Amino acid sequence: MPAQGHRLYVKAKHLSFQRSKHVIHPGTSIVKIEGCDSKEEAQFYLGKRVCYVYKSSKAVRGSKIRVIWGTIARPHGNSGAVRARFVHNLPAKTFGSSLRVMLYPSNI
């Protein structure tokens, strides 16, 4: 039986920035986590690390892969979306792209 790979993260999508009718707040991103469909399920992910992994054209310290880190702050709505705050705001071109929600730090 072949060994299966184990992920330390859950896939998620970057939906939007937090916004009102006229004002956009790019410091807070709305993230939809796969398999998370209620506010109660979203509670598990509060405080977890989230990252956006992307590739650049120029290598820095031998790697073209870069990461923007953030933290899950609170639930957003009743359908399992969460709000995340990143160290550097995500660019708007990441709307719809994949994020990784790490399963650490654990609060179990």
From Swiss-Prot:
Its main location: cytoplasm. PROSITE patterns: RIBOSOMAL_L35AE. The modification Phosphoserine is found at S98. Disulfide bonds: none annotated. Keywords: Cytoplasm, Phosphoprotein, Ribonucleoprotein, Ribosomal protein. It is found in: Cytoplasm. One of its GO terms (biological process) is ribosomal large subunit biogenesis. There are 2 genes for eL33 in S.pombe. Component of the large ribosomal subunit (LSU). Mature yeast ribosomes consist of a small (40S) and a large (60S) subunit. The 40S small subunit contains 1 molecule of ribosomal RNA (18S rRNA) and at least 33 different proteins. The large 60S subunit contains 3 rRNA molecules (25S, 5.8S and 5S rRNA) and at least 46 different proteins. PANTHER family: 60S RIBOSOMAL PROTEIN L35A (PTHR10902). Belongs to the eukaryotic ribosomal protein eL33 family. This is Large ribosomal subunit protein eL33B. It comes from Schizosaccharomyces pombe (strain 972 / ATCC 24843) (Fission yeast). The gene is rpl35a.
